[in-house]
Amino acid sequence: MELKQISSNKCFGGLQKVFEHSSVELKCKMKFAIYLPPQAESAKCPALYWLSGLTCTEQNFISKSGCQQAASEHGLVVIAPDTSPRGCNIKGEDDSWDFGTGAGFFVNATEDPWNTNYRMYSYVTEELPQLINANFPVDPQRISIFGHSMGGHGALICALKNPGKYRSVSAFAPICNPVLCPWGKKAFNGYLGPDQSKWKAYDATCLVKSYSGPQIDILIDQGKDDEFLSNGQLLPDNFIAACTEKKIPVVFRLQEGYDHSYYFIATFITDHIRHHAKYLNA
């Protein structure tokens, strides 16, 4: 699998790089960002995958979150893929900001015309890790995942659908119960069709109820002044209730005065990287 380097910038002793490759799953060219800490020059490091939110590319997280300082300190390789296939020339892919381009929702679409390209779930859990493991100094046994909003949803479902694959999971303002919120209903109806029983396979709150894997410790930060919390897009209470019932440990922190933006993410990113480092470096 050929990788084309798009950029490389020294940052906190390591290198922040962006690559492009031709994706088999998505049948298009895809970019991903990867931060290689200084420790990666001499040893295989754990890998931490970040999934971004609606409208984002691979750039938002690496330029706005300030993740590199903590990643350098803890010796973590941080990988940030794009949020959807790009340039597939599907009718309607650019019609709205919350569906199609920049809004893959980390599902494998089953509905025509999306099912050929929109396979972000398999891309993130299978194709991309294989590519990373083959080309970079990462330890394939030590991986974790986190994300924001739509990507927080993605991180939670990837961890819950693959017991034991990820050492830890965390999220900022995740879409916790997409089968019940407007964003989720729109995306799932488009990608997965009208049969709502299929939607549950990609809903963290539904997945928790049937989870039977090894214990997984979940960290969630949520801004109290997040407009998408107040208008019912995120529904964290439903997820927490399901976790409590299943005795799955969740640290849920409602952060006074914070919104849905990268200013919020940047404030708490070090806490999240520390959370993952605790499990990845154990």
From Swiss-Prot:
Residues with PTM N6-acetyllysine: K200
Subcellular location: Cytoplasm; Cytoplasmic vesicle
Major site of localization recorded for this protein: cytoplasm
Keywords assigned: Acetylation, Cytoplasm, Cytoplasmic vesicle, Hydrolase, Serine esterase
Example of a GO biological process term: formaldehyde catabolic process
Membrane-spanning segments: none
SUBUNIT field: Homodimer.
Family indicated by similarity: Belongs to the esterase D family.
Protein name, as recorded: S-formylglutathione hydrolase
Native source species: Rattus norvegicus (Rat)
Gene from which this protein is expressed: Esd
